[in-house]
Amino acid sequence: MNAPGWGRRGLVAAATLGAWAGWQAARVKRARRRTDRTDRFRHVPDDPRHCVVVAGDSTAVGVGAGNPRLSVAGRLALALRDARIVNVAHSGARLADVPHQLRRVFGLIDASLCVVLCGANDVLRFTSPARVRRNVRALIGLAQRADVPLVLVPPGHIGAAPLWLPPLSWLLSWRARGVRRALFGAAHKQSGVEVVDLVLPARKDPFRAAPAAHYAADGLHPNANGYGQWFEQLVQQSRAVQHRLPPARRAPRVQLAHRLFR
């Protein structure tokens, strides 16, 4: 026979869980209302000398930037003034969707570089690590067959985004580590492939030091400052991007550290 105290504790626990779920659901609903409808940045200069393809999810679109020119694609156009920027990303994409995005353009244009920002939706939708590895290998194979250098930019600390409440934030942080580990493993030592690591030590991570200054109003996507930080990491870590920059714009290249277990 159950003691009366256990029944009361169960009711309190159920009420607490219900309140937490309602609060988190309300935050997600509010975030969806606040998510801007940024258009994909595309650019064709007067005399393009090479073509950069940008693909992936809403972060490749530039959701949260406010101005498409302040997205990663927009900043690439500013830095690579003689480059045509072709953006085929769409919000909600997972890694499995990226090859479909690229097949539409690789057969039509002569791309000199492909930058893929993707993986967040694989974290949020619980794509298994095995499937992440398969999807990344398919993406890499497509780029290699097209002879296009590939730069992969997986997400940073998704669980640390202000949108999420504990313990969901902890779960998403754990999930993000698994997805990143699978992605890095699939890309390891692949010819023509670089991976940019957006996960920085806590003391050096501006997203954790000053979240209000780097996250958009939805509490999930970067804002213009946040995309600026991502772009700086892209420039510092990617040899393929640095090679295409004017000499004055090149930064000291950072040796990529596999900080997967922190």
Predicted regions and their residues:
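Alpha/beta-hydrolase-fold catalytic nucleophile elbow
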Residues: 117, 153-154
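A short helix->loop->beta-strand "cap" motif at the edges of active sites that frequently abuts
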Residues: 146-149
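Short, conserved phosphate/pyrophosphate- and ester-handling motifs at nucleotide-, phospho-/glycolipid
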Residues: 223
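Conserved SGNH/GDSL esterase-like catalytic core that processes O-acyl groups on lipids
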Residues: 51-53, 59-134
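Substrate-gating cap/lid alpha-helix
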Residues: 161-197
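Residue-level recognition of beta-strand->loop/alpha-helix junctions
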Residues: 87-89, 154, 197-199
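N-terminal secretory targeting modules
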Residues: 1-53, 235, 241-262
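Short "lid" loop at the C-terminus of a central beta-strand within the Rossmann-like core
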Residues: 156-159, 201
